[in-house]
Amino acid sequence: EGRAPADELVFMLNGLDTDFDGENNFYGANTIPFYYQHHPIEISTNELIRAYVVNILEFDPVNNFHLHGTLFHHFPAGTDTVPSGFNDMLTMSQGEREILEFEYKYPGLYMFHAHNTEFSEKGWVGSFLAKDSEKNYSDEN
């Protein structure tokens, strides 16, 4: 059957050791620190968003993804069509990958970030800008 149609995106969670001391100086989603904080990802309300998330962070054993304003279904390694959980935060070890599926009901600016203060302060933070879609949302959903 496959997965339902969705607006899809990829997050490569990584860090940058700019002084080669074996510790990351910056963190980010898709390499550029703070990029999605200054350039929010535009999405439509009431439409399924599918994020392919890969933790390629070096020098730190775990990373995580926290989403504000809604919850997501997650699929470890993307190997099943049945979600293994429904949450707003996910912790991943090095090399781990997940598929996250979520929707926003209301328009607005919604933050996503690492749930590690150091990572967020050094660049792993961003936002989704949810805009009204043409779809009508039923309170029954």
Spans of features found by a protein language model:
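Copper-binding active sites and cupredoxin-like electron-transfer domains
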Residues: E1-N141
